[in-house]
Amino acid sequence: MHERYVPADVEAAAQSDWRAADAYRSKEDANRKKFYCVSMLPYPSGKLHMGHVRNYTINDVMYRYLRMNGYNTLMPMGWDAFGMPAENAAMANGVPPAQWTYENIAYMKKQMQSMGLAIDWSREVTTCKPDYYKWNQWLFLKMLEKGVAYKKTGTVNWDPVDQTVLANEQVIDGRGWRSGALVEKREIPMYYMRITQYADELLNDLDGLGWPERVKVMQHNWIGKSFGVNFGFPYELDGEKKLLRVFTTRADTIMGVTFCAIAAEHPLAARLARDKPALQAFIDECKRGGVAEADIATMEKKGVATGFSVSHPLTGEPVEVWIGNYVLMSYGEGAVMGVPAHDERDFAFAKKYGLPIRQVIAVEGETYSTDAWQEWYGDKTRAVCVNSGKYDGLAHDAAVDAIAAELKAGGLGDKQITYRLRDWGISRQRYWGTPIPIIHCPSCGDVPVPEQDLPVVLPEDLVPDGTGNPLAKSDAFLNCTCPKCGAAAKRETDTMDTFVDSAWYFSRYAAPDAQTMVDARTDYWMPMDQYIGGIEHAILHLLYSRFWAKVMRDLGLVAFGEPAKNLLTQGMVLNETFYREDAAGKKTWYNPADVTVSFDDKGRPVGAVLKSDGQPVELGGIEKMSKSKNNGVDPQMLIDHYGADTARLFTMFAAPPEQQLEWSGAGVDGASRFLRRVWAFGFANREALAVRAPFDAAQLAEADKTLRREIHGVLKQADFDYQRLQYNTVVSAAMKMLNAIEGAKGATPAVLRETYGVLLRVLYPVVPHVTFELWKALGYADEFGPLLDAPWPKVDEAALEQAEIELVLQVNGKVRGALKVAKDASREAIEAAAVADGMFAKFAEGRPAKKIIVVPGRLVNVVV
């Protein structure tokens, strides 16, 4: 054992032992309680960031603590390796996405290994490898057979210059991110998965999950179950009688309809624009720009009158039809009723275009005005109908029931339950993804690839150039024969949404070498006992993975319908930001490592200069670590300088896992100093700590009893904190333990050995390298086995008992000191001790005690 703690040497030695022992390989064991903990698999972007370090350390701490408590634990890892960033990097660097991806995986895996993570690498999954995505294709075909997957036209962003489909995030201010061309909306055939078929189950099953309430609410709102009325506005066109159908949750306001708005893609819009160039021009304008719902919500609401009217379903009055850029064909019926008096968006639209505003609900004590929108205008809890004929005076629910009944009687509509959730469009007009296993035959149409021909392998040597899908230009991939008739045919060139890859990888971890998609091992490990990842995945990934599990269950592949029992969404890692702004308002951001900050006498930052030129930079505040703000900390530099254990200790100590973590260089230094103290005590007392003499706890001297009482008391709290995932207070407990052990005067070697061994085991899940090496060097491994599988220390409840207790001494209700009495002292003995105490004499100033109040175990108050 070396005198000086050298993290690089300590960590290399520990990791060497773990590799030699294949320490983290997990096996199924029906006789043991399992614990399966998974961090969301990373995208191989090139390097780990501090968010990764925090996430994986939380997972690792959980794994090690539960393994010490006898659980059969599994912590796997993989790579979410398909996706657009690899294509962008390929275009920038002129290399195939596969090369860029595999190089990044190799480096990031090395970084993870340097962190000492308890990963079972034998279960590693890489989603861009054929042995994985084969099962994406296989399940897609099964879903196609069952009608859970299907084909229909969908709207996409089309770049007319690059001749390619753009993702929503590639559309910036309505233009393509590379070409700058105005983006168009196009309708193309795409494959969808019928997630709406599972909407109610996805909603109802949220109640049984140990997930953060915030995530449940987000999913609940995303699914968006609505109870309303679907009805039609009658009209006649080209000699045909039709209905313009809409859905509303506010049928009680139907008498306030003054216009209808339809989507630019609505069939009625195309018909009405035939001989109206201005209308067609507006439709074309609407078809340019992004198709994301978020974009629609924030953009300027515009519309054009069509000059055509439909009939109000209850009054028969004409209702003008407008085309609105805010109406989505993919939501509802592609048409909405306009009630400006009681819908904020409609109110603004009507004010902009001078449309009538007709009040049809009222709230007692409120006065309606068309001058400005007021929140109560849309209130349905207090509102009653007015200006609505026979419905006047009805509250919301009664009005909806009555109006729905009248619409139904007239054959115009009925009550309906709808969902905000839409079927999942999985087709992506991109190269780097799972090929969709469909062959297009001129004679047979769309033909599924036979199961024996799976996987359809994605060529890995193509380099995208930004102009169209490389697969469509690859004859080797594109050209094939029809499995049905043998004629020349073409492969589907669309690939699957990368959320498909991440929808089930945790099930494959359980059986990575299975010759089927999953096997019995999957039902042993799944569902995950703990899933860990960022709140940004609350909706899409987590919702799709829940859907995928239910589909797999219904196909008889697995026994579970939910992938994760518990979810932890770790907080973001924050850091200071610094910048300079030029005359044009452009900001240049500087990394905190390149800046010197000055502080006031209260430790608050008051100024900063750039180290390279000594000139001032602006303080930008504390924000999430990001490339855009250049305020990240390179984990590798941190590990190289301080060691992985210091990085792990700081990230666990600085904040509870679910809260934001503010980066602190001083905090990292403090973590490093603490580990050096742990090592220094072990080295300085190595001879005493080697003593394995048994002892009778009841016969120990007071110094030994005091130390054991403190250590076992803190151990009890640390164990509780581990169970509730409050790892920051676990570290605090370890610090208290070290302080107590260092400060123990007169403790015997045997008790020092016991208590220091408790400290090492409490710290081990957080800092496994240094504790593993100290455990071995000081002979604990010879007694208990390697720290990897050493049992969690048991609290000695007898050690917590005290012969004496300390009570707060008060005089006239004010704290004046402390009083030590026997634990079983009678009330009379406590009263006598209180009036005999010197502090009572000092503050009573000769006055006798009138009354003595004793609160057992807590305080004694003498009233004079």
From Swiss-Prot:
HAMAP family: Leu_tRNA_synth_B (MF_00049_B). Disulfide bonds: none annotated. A motif ('HIGH' region) lies at residues 42-52. It comes from Burkholderia pseudomallei (strain K96243). It is found in: Cytoplasm. Keywords: Aminoacyl-tRNA synthetase, ATP-binding, Cytoplasm, Ligase, Nucleotide-binding, Protein biosynthesis. GO terms for molecular function: aminoacyl-tRNA deacylase activity; ATP binding; leucine-tRNA ligase activity. GO terms for cellular component: cytosol. It catalyses: tRNA(Leu) + L-leucine + ATP = L-leucyl-tRNA(Leu) + AMP + diphosphate. This is Leucine--tRNA ligase. GO terms for biological process: leucyl-tRNA aminoacylation. PANTHER family: LEUCINE--TRNA LIGASE, MITOCHONDRIAL (PTHR43740:SF2), LEUCYL-TRNA SYNTHETASE (PTHR43740). Pfam families: Anticodon_1 (PF08264), tRNA-synt_1 (PF00133), tRNA-synt_1_2 (PF13603), tRNA-synt_1g (PF09334). Gene3D superfamilies: 2.20.28.290, 3.10.20.590, HUPs, Isoleucyl-tRNA Synthetase, Domain 1, Valyl/Leucyl/Isoleucyl-tRNA synthetase, editing domain. Its main location: cytoplasm. A motif ('KMSKS' region) lies at residues 624-628. Belongs to the class-I aminoacyl-tRNA synthetase family. It is an enzyme of class 6 (ligase). ATP binds at K627. CDD domains: Anticodon_Ia_Leu_BEm, LeuRS_core. Its EC number is 6.1.1.4.
